[in-house]
């Protein structure tokens, strides 16, 4: 009973200590920096997605598939127009604003739970594990709320049609069409493997970044180039480690809206097995180099977030 009472008292105290202003600042700083960076790297993002899903796209025949990142960059403006590089970007910004903002905001709240009373100087491994846990939990929580928008972004970016040949005319049309054909399940296809991937990615993304910065003598006054270097390494490593999960979830997303006879993967496990068997393990990393370049935007988000918080 004593432990239960102590737990309740601790939770009550945490509720009273909740900083509403700080929460809003976290939300605003994370959202603004994310929206700016995602728009800047949108062309790379679209190339990466096309390389990931073209193998099962109904719009891209085997002889029309992109040979690689450079080929994709050259052909997109020729075949679909220059502005098509930003196809799906609006959905991405709308999705990314709450996603990143919630990630950053809840990350700090989870840190209160996992890192309360932990001394980083004398309890390094507990501090490290707490950062991993808070980062992973924040990412998974956010994903539950915004997955349909992530789904729509993927389908819009994968749409290679031009004019009347496009599969979807926009965000609303995409969500409506899939909901009518597949129901809410269609909008959450690939959710399971997404949660697995997001936990791995966010755990590394936030965990290693916060741990590295926490080990610096004066984290708040760290030169921006050092913060940038740390962020760049973190986003690259996290992206490569979780990339196969991302490829599988994108492939699963591409199946929504298809007739039963056109469905390629029975479930997530079948998707993993089929890709490995038919395309080889290298297929799990298609577009990975584009993802590393895109990671520059992710590193920019982390650094810009810290800078905006200083202003706010």
Swiss-Prot record:
The keyword DNA damage does not apply. The gene is sesB. The transmembrane helices are not perpendicular to the plane of the membrane, but cross the membrane at an angle. Odd-numbered transmembrane helices exhibit a sharp kink, due to the presence of a conserved proline residue. One of its GO terms (cellular component) is mitochondrion. This is ADP,ATP carrier protein. It comes from the Eukaryota. It is a multi-pass membrane protein. Gene3D superfamilies: Mitochondrial carrier domain (1.50.40.10). GO terms for molecular function: ATP:ADP antiporter activity. The matrix-open state (m-state) is inhibited by the membrane-permeable bongkrekic acid (BKA). The cytoplasmic-open state (c-state) is inhibited by the membrane-impermeable toxic inhibitor carboxyatractyloside (CATR).
